[in-house]
Curated annotation (Swiss-Prot), chain B:
Keyword Nucleus included in the entry's annotation: yes
GO BP annotations listed: auxin-activated signaling pathway; jasmonic acid mediated signaling pathway; protein ubiquitination; response to auxin; response to jasmonic acid; ubiquitin-dependent protein catabolic process
Cited Gene3D superfamilies: Potassium Channel Kv1.1, Chain A (3.30.710.10)
Pathway(s) per entry: Protein modification; protein ubiquitination
Signal sequence coordinates: none
Keyword vocabulary terms for this entry: Nucleus, Ubl conjugation pathway
Domain of life where this protein originates: Eukaryota
Organism classification: Eukaryota, Viridiplantae, Streptophyta, Embryophyta, Tracheophyta
Subunit note: Part of a SCF (SKP1-cullin-F-box) protein ligase complex. Interacts with ADO3/FKF1, COI1/FBL2, EBF1/FBL6, PP2B10, At3g61590 and At5g49610.
Protein's UniProt name: SKP1-like protein 12
Role according to the record: Involved in ubiquitination and subsequent proteasomal degradation of target proteins. Together with CUL1, RBX1 and a F-box protein, it forms a SCF E3 ubiquitin ligase complex. The functional specificity of this complex depends on the type of F-box protein. In the SCF complex, it serves as an adapter that links the F-box protein to CUL1. Plays a role during early flowers reproductive development.
């Protein structure tokens, strides 16, 4: 039989899980360099983007655990790529107590940047600091273009098409606005998001998502339908980006025994438009729920094997789910993270996010 | 209404009559049909009859229309049975799907092989793909250590 030519072997390898690909670097010198090449990592990313997955991290006793990595929560932020096990410690930054960090991606310059709140708004110091990942020396710098002053940030950020969005509360009469940070130009803009005002008391359940290309906010609350307690998903979609018009949609979820009796949160939206809900704490059995607004279907999926460690009742940990996780082999210069507990490092305590590029949301 | 038939000829001299609509799932064949050089049949010098039979079986199944109204879910189940083949046959199918430029078959065969090899040791992979190990034991150990995480 004719031997398989190298380019076809590459095609086969591009469909492997990242762990296998990294392991195959020991095949030979030729393959070690082929598997590290930009051509292959791009090919791998294309394949991986066609099968986005849910990535889970469980937090317990101050350690954040991805399937193979353990990180501890501390003051010093870290960016890590759970696919490759590489991490980068970010240089220390003086921040005020509730300062948030956001991760954004510039699709044109192909760069990741971290935007961090630093000081409360004042004339003496810049409110934000920016750090570009992938450069030789990581350092924080002040943004050149000022951000309009606001009282506090209210949500995690989401990066869509190279713009980082997050919800903030205005100074003076409290009202919601969306802060937009263009990752490439580092310019700030903002627009009204008064539709979220009635949640100013508690925005913890609200997340910003990319719903079919549009910025949206989702949260849930209990409702009532006759005798039955229902679960309602509320979604505000920025239908008109020019005029900044939001449209609100309310969905009453179909009855589901498991969902109706557990603690859950909204994890995000998949590229296919399914809203993903995830149980809050590890337990056995652990479920994730997919709600499709167009078809009004609710599907529960059992996730097995968080490991007996996390599943034991006394050990339950808070679960974070990342939707649209795509394996990415491109590696910033960084040290190898050892996966044993004895070598704990730190996770960015402000956003708990990992370096998975949000721009994958665009790939339909 | 009779559908247009074309003749495909394998490398070992066997002829197969196939509906044109089914055959043009192969981009290679589709181009030849466009260029109108199919009158005497299409010689496929790189595809043995044993493999061509499987390719034709695949294309017939994937030619979905009123006569063959199959669902995506059923196709996926069919794929699994179809790919229950010896590894060497699957490799030949990869080569054929590549040569004939049938994207979905190429994806299916490559993914099947990827799934078969993902748990294998580097030694087994070298043997499967005829890769010569040009690392010294020390060099190989160094690469392993560098990527320790992938071996746990």
């Amino acid at each position: 039989m004719e031997p398989i030519p190298n380019d076809l072997i590459l095609e086969i390898f591009s469909r492997l899980p990242a762990k296998s690909v990294i392991g195959f670097r020991t095949l030979s010198k030729h393959w070690a360099s082929m598997l590290r090449s930009p051509v292959f990592t791009e090919l791998f990313l294309t394949r991986s983007s066609n099968r986005p997955r849910l990535l889970f991290a469980a937090e317990r006793n101050g350690l954040l655990c991805f399937p193979d990595l353990w990180l501890s929560k501390d003051a010093s932020p870290v960016i890590c790529n759970p696919t490759t096990g590489m991490y980068e410690s970010l240089p220390d930054l003086m921040r005020y107590k509730n300062a948030r960090g956001f991760l954004g991606f510039d699709p044109i310059g192909k760069q990741f940047k971290v935007l961090s709140e630093a000081y409360p708004f004042s004339d003496q110091r810049e409110h934000h600091e920016i750090l570009t990942l992938g450069t030789e020396e990581l350092s924080w710098r002040s943004n050149i273009i000022s951000c309009p002053a606001y009282d506090r940030s209210l949500s995690e950020g989401i990066c869509i098409n190279g713009v980082l969005y997050y919800l903030a509360q205005t100074l003076g009469v409290p009202s919601c606005v969306i802060i937009c940070f263009d990752v490439r130009s580092e310019e700030f803009k903002y627009f009204d998001a008064g539709c979220f005002n009635d949640q100013l008391d508690d925005t913890s359940g609200l997340i910003l998502v990319n719903y079919e290309g549009k910025l949206s906010g989702i949260n849930w609350k209990y409702g009532q339908a006759g005798e039955r307690r229902t679960v309602e998903l509320r979604m505000w979609v920025l239908e008109d980006a020019e005029k900044h018009e939001w449209v609100k949609y309310v969905y009453t979820l179909p009855e589901n025994e498991v969902l109706d009796s557990c603690d859950f949160s909204v994890a995000g939206v998949t590229t296919r438009g399914d809203i993903v809900l995830c149980m809050k704490y590890t337990c056995k059995p652990f479920y994730v729920f997919y709600f499709n607004p167009e078809r009004n279907t609710l599907q529960s999926v059992e996730i097995q094997d968080f490991g007996a460690n996390l599943e034991a009742v006394e050990n339950c940990g808070r679960v974070y789910a990342f939707v649209n996780h795509v394996e990415d082999l491109r590696v910033n210069k960084g040290k190898q993270l050892k996966s044993s507990i004895s070598q704990v490092k730190h996770l960015c305590s402000c956003c708990n996010k990992v370096s998975q590029p949000d721009y994958h949301y665009q790939k339909a | 209404m009779s559908s247009k038939m074309i003749v495909l000829m394998s490398s070992d001299g066997q002829s197969f009559e196939v509906e044109e609509a089914v055959a043009i799932q192969s981009q290679t064949i589709a181009h030849m049909v466009e260029d109108d050089c199919v009158a005497d049949g299409i010689p496929l010098a790189n595809v043995e009859s044993k493999i061509l039979v499987k390719v034709i079986e695949y294309c017939k199944k994937y030619h979905v229309d009123e006569a063959n109204p199959i669902s995506e879910e059923d196709l996926n189940k069919w794929d699994e049975k179809f790919m229950d083949l010896e590894q060497s046959t699957i490799f030949e199918l990869i080569l054929a799907a590549n040569y004939l430029n049938i994207k979905s078959l190429f994806d299916l065969t490559c993914q099947t092989v990827a799934d078969m090899i993902k748990g294998k040791t580097p030694e087994e992979i070298r043997s499967t793909f005829n890769i010569e190990n040009d690392f010294t034991p020390e060099e190989e150990e160094a690469v392993r250590k560098e990527n320790q995480w992938a071996f746990e």
